[in-house]
């Protein structure tokens, strides 16, 4: 079942944030420290922000199996960009012990439906090129590159 995250979910969300960070740290230790993206206190603030919904997949015991952090974005009165509403996926993770059960696909589908229900034009996300499994997952969901970030390490 997919539902909105609640304060009681923060400990498990924190564990999953650490799993994501470890993948990023292993792929790009020059950029990512070992840790997690948000503290428990920051998560409490995010949970109250209607512009930053967090969807969670839970099992029959209401235990979190995965999450999808979202952010509503909209450029208004921009000289170049059109005024469209976007749902940006800031982070999507399924517990590494539960992968392969289509939980990620269910979370992504719920995010798409949530975006539609909220009048969004599109859904976007960023994925690090070192995270090949995530890239394959998003491609299997039908996402295509919108823009490409490039770098040269000096």
Protein language model features and the residues they cover:
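Conserved beta-strand in the GNAT
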Residues: 56, 63-72, 88, 93
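A short helix-loop-beta-strand connector motif used in the catalytic cores of GNAT acetyltransferases and
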Residues: 44-56, 88
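A short beta-loop-alpha structural element at the N-terminal edge
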Residues: 1-15
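Conserved active-site alpha-helix within GNAT-family acetyltransferase domains
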Residues: 105, 109, 117, 129-147
């Amino acid at each position: 079942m997919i539902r909105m995250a609640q304060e009681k979910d923060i400990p498990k969300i924190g564990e999953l944030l650490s799993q994501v960070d470890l993948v990023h740290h292993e792929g790009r230790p020059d950029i990512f420290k070992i840790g997690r993206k948000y503290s428990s206190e920051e998560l409490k603030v995010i949970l109250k922000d209607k512009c930053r919904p967090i969807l969670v997949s839970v099992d029959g015991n209401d235990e979190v199996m995965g999450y999808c952090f979202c952010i509503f974005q909209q450029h208004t009165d921009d000289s170049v960009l059109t005024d469209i509403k976007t749902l940006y996926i800031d982070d999507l993770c399924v517990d590494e012990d539960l992968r392969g059960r289509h939980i990620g696909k269910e979370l992504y589908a719920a995010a798409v439906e949530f975006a539609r229900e909220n009048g969004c034009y599109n859904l976007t996300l960023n994925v690090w090129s070192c995270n090949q499994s995530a890239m394959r997952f998003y491609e299997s969901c039908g996402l295509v590159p919108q823009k490409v970030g490039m770098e040269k390490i000096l």
